């Protein structure tokens, strides 16, 4: 096809007409298989009048060359390299220049600097050009090719650092500054000790460049701040001599309310990281006071008139998690304080922080009082030991006072603080039940019907406090149960019922057998939720399954008569509802029931293990992420002949040239795998001999998860494998046989070296 015909097809793809795009895509897939397609694309990327067509042609050419570069004749490769560099020098549209630079980077990954000296010559000439547009093009090209293969430029680091020292001083050219910072971002992890003197010279200019970029383009400035992150993380000490200047710059941006939230949040993230990696230097240089004096006003900032902070709103339409979830500078400033508590000695942090806390808590402003409570909440994590030993009574008194504050925003913060104290200050906090429980119960009763967001905060604090009380919960059990059962009886929202069912689990954990008088009423409500077909009650169903598992462990023997019914309910829901949270809660229920039923669970093991194997094998929730210039994946539909030819090609193309830039995995699916491992391990031990027919297949799938990228899943897989060893040993003792004994020996040997033995070896006869 001539370039004019190809251009018309590309125009069709740019129209807002789905049907025409579909037809044009089908035609284009056919056209692009022809040998003449590549010359036509090259003609368009260099000479088409419409910049959109030039850009599209460059993207398609890059995609084409990505898998076919080695097939081209040497002359054609040299011609293409020359054409692309010429087009790049002539191009005036930024979007096209970027696509041409990315095309150059694709070729560079395959050729390298030695095989493409013209690229290096162009970079050297353009980046030192006296003409600003040409220089900006050179820096754009440099940033893209360095990012594509940074190790190739290590021999040129000194030359590049000298160049960046010049370009970062060009405060009148924002484009130059941005691409210089992008280049520095990529280089930073590869800097060596020899590079340090030149790299340190860039730090003041980096700050100046950021100060120039922020008023012009906050989005670009957010991206450019990655350079600061990388230098902070660098193994060589580049930032340290300029730590004070870097901190001053960050604090100036963070406190500037005239700037947008995005750039202030991004700079607060830099501060969080700075505290993590430079905490000792902060103390040594006495930089903690200015940091705290900047953070506190941000935490205490009032929202715009007539508005509330996200966590203080009571909207069921978009309910936030009980944790600090607002995307505002306030919440990220709290995270900086949290990081300070984690990485500074409390005897250094608390004396400077406590006077500010006391002043805030005495303030007439509810947002000042809220700030004090939020800071107390996060202090309980990093400075937990210090608080337990020296400060718990007075600080808990402050939190309890906050629960009775006239302002709802302060009460919300006090509930959050109490929940954090309950998580982080065990077991000491539980000894204050006489002071805390009456306040929590009074608060629960005061929440108006329908205010589920406030109820969620109360339940968060209640659950965290109650579940560790043990027998100390008994005096409060009648009142607690009346509150929870009332929520279940009333025509309240599904969210309110979900919160009540969750709280019942925490109460059961503490109360154990003392819960028996309330057991029939609880089961009546749970059975109702588990049998409902209402879609809006699905979260309540999931929570009911989780609470049912907790009840099975807490109540124990009295629940045995209901074990078979609970098992059937769980299996039925797994058949009806496709949801990872529902499955993981059901598996936890099965694990709890296995402790009651033992080998009595045998009739259901085939169905249970089948479900669990599907969860262990599932790749659901793993979503490929494509780079920003995806070209409709027009080359995915290649003929089998071409694929076979490519497989036989001696020059195997690099996998990282794919347009898939990474994968995202929804946390729910990792949680499902983690809980599946935990449940199947427990079931194997409790059901003993009955589990043996399923041991091999389950072992194989759990073994594969030792390579899972998610730490918690790997940990759960290791624990499950250990439980399989215990289960097989137990089965051999109760039912000795030659195959069982041999299997136990092999499993034990494999358990001693998971890294070297595979499941096939372990179970081979």
Q: What do the PLM-derived regions correspond to, one by one?
A:
Residues 1-765:
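Karyopherin-beta/Importin-beta family HEAT-repeat alpha-solenoid scaffold
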């Amino acid at each position: 096809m001539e370039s004019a015909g190809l251009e018309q097809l590309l125009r069709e793809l740019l129209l807002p007409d789905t049907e025409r795009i579909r037809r044009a895509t089908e035609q284009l897939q056919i056209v692009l298989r022809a040998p003449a397609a590549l010359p036509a694309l090259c003609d368009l990327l260099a000479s088409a009048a419409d910049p959109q067509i030039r850009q599209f042609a460059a993207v398609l050419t890059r995609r084409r060359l990505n898998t076919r570069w080695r097939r081209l004749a040497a002359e054609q490769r040299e011609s293409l390299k020359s054409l692309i560099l010429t087009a790049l020098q002539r191009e005036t549209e930024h979007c096209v220049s970027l696509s041409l630079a990315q095309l150059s980077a694709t070729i560079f990954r395959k050729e390298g600097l030695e095989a493409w000296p013209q690229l290096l010559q162009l970079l050297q000439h353009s980046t030192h050009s006296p003409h600003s547009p040409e220089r900006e093009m050179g820096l754009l090209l440099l940033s893209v090719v360095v990012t594509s293969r940074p190790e190739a430029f290590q021999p040129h680091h000194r030359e590049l650092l000298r160049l960046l020292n010049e370009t970062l001083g060009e405060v009148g050219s924002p484009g130059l500054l941005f691409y210089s910072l992008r280049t520095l971002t990529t280089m930073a992890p590869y800097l060596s000790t020899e590079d340090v003197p030149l790299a340190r010279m860039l730090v003041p200019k980096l700050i100046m460049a950021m100060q120039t970029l922020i008023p012009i383009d906050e989005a670009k400035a957010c991206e450019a701040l990655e350079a600061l992150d990388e230098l902070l993380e660098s193994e060589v000490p580049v930032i340290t001599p300029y730590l004070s200047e870097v901190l001053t710059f960050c604090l100036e941006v963070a406190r500037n309310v005239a700037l947008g939230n995005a750039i202030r949040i991004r700079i607060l993230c830099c501060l969080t990281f700075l505290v993590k990696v430079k905490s000792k230097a902060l103390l040594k240089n006495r930089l903690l006071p200015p940091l705290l004096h900047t953070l506190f006003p941000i935490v205490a900032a009032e929202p715009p008139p007539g508005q509330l902070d996200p966590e203080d709103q009571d909207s069921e339409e978009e309910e936030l998690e009980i944790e600090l979830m607002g995307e505002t500078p306030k919440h990220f400033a709290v995270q900086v304080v949290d990081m300070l508590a984690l990485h500074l000695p409390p005897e250094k942090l608390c004396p400077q922080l406590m006077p500010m806390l006391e002043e805030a808590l005495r303030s007439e402003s509810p947002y000042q009082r809220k700030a004090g409570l939020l800071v107390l909440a996060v202090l309980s994590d990093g400075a937990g030991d210090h608080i337990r030993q020296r400060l718990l009574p007075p600080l808990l008194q402050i939190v309890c006072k906050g629960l009775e504050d006239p302002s709802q925003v302060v009460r919300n913060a006090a509930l959050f603080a109490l929940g954090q104290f309950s998580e982080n200050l065990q077991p000491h906090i539980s000894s204050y039940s006489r002071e805390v429980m009456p306040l929590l119960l009074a608060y629960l009763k005061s929440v108006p019907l329908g205010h589920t967001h406030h109820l969620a905060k109360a339940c968060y604090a209640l659950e965290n406090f109650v579940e560790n009380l043990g027998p100390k919960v008994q005096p409060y059990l009648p009142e607690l149960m009346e509150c929870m059962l009332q929520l279940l009886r009333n025509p309240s929202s599904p969210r309110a019922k979900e919160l009540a069912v969750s709280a019942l689990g925490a109460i059961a954990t503490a109360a154990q057998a003392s819960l028996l008088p309330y057991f029939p009423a609880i089961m009546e409500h749970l059975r109702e939720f588990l049998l409902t077909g209402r879609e809006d009650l699905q979260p309540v169903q999931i929570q009911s399954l989780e609470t049912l598992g907790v009840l099975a462990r807490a109540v124990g023997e009295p629940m045995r008569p209901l074990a078979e019914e609970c098992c059937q309910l769980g299996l039925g829901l797994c058949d009806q509802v496709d949801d990872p949270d529902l499955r993981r809660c059901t598996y936890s229920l099965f694990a709890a029931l296995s402790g009651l039923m033992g080998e009595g669970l045998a009739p259901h093991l085939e169905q249970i293990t089948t479900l669990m194997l599907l969860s262990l094998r599932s790749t659901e929730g793993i979503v490929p992420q494509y780079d920003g210039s995806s070209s409709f994946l027009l080359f995915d539909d290649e003929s089998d002949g071409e694929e076979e030819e490519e497989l036989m090609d001696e020059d195997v193309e690099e996998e990282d040239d794919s347009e898939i830039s990474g994968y995202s995995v929804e946390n729910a699916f990792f949680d499902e795998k983690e809980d599946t491992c935990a449940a199947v391990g427990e079931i194997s031990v409790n059901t003993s001999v009955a589990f043996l027919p399923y041991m091999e297949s389950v072992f194989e799938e759990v073994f594969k998860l030792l390579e899972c990228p998610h730490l918690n899943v790997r940990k759960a897989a290791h624990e499950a494998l250990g439980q399989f060893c215990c289960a097989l040993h137990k089965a051999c003792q109760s039912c000795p046989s030659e195959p069982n004994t041999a299997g136990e020996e092999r499993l034990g040997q494999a358990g001693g070296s998971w890294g070297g033995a595979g499941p096939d070896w372990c179970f081979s006869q």
